[in-house]
Amino acid sequence: MEPIKSFTSTIVALPLENIDTDQIIPAKYLKVTDKTGLGEGLFQSWRYNADGSPKPDFVLNRPDVQGAQILIAGNNFGCGSSREHAVWALQGYGFKAVISTYFASIFNNNALKNGLLPIVVDQETYYQLVSLFDEDPETTLTVDLVNQQLILPEGQTIAFPIDPFAKHCLVNGVDQLGFLAAEEPAIEAYESAHPARVQTV
């Protein structure tokens, strides 16, 4: 998993509420176990016509937003069914962080476990970010995970919360299994020092 400490990127706003996982990635992709290429299916019904041609009026198809790594999304993002593929599709497209006023809990957990940073902001900040994008699509935003803050173009900082363990994993680029593997020597030392507490089959 790629570490996330601090990065600066342009943003893209999709100010729609209740974007569910089926809209993020259609169910037909759920049989896929390889993450490669899932970015092409991101928001498929919104991005493409029936013949596969891109819809020019959809925001992600605009030439001036290509390469954006930060998505600004409406409230209750990632609701609906539990599908890890939704996170994989967002990452496959190139997003490293999604900012919203609220994330569905299962999506939020899937994002953190896979290295996609979900950032919760208040309503005022959300509208401010959407306005920045509307005024200038080339606006850049810095995500400073180490200090848990967003840095706007003119230097304004906005703090955001994150679970301490999730932050540790993201900053160090390790998933939960990787964290446990790194702690194996300490676990073995504890078990050796406290044999009566170790239950064996």
Roles of regions detected by a PLM:
Residues 1-74, 78-79, 85-105, 109-201:
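Cytosolic catalytic domains that perform sulfur/thiol-centered chemistry
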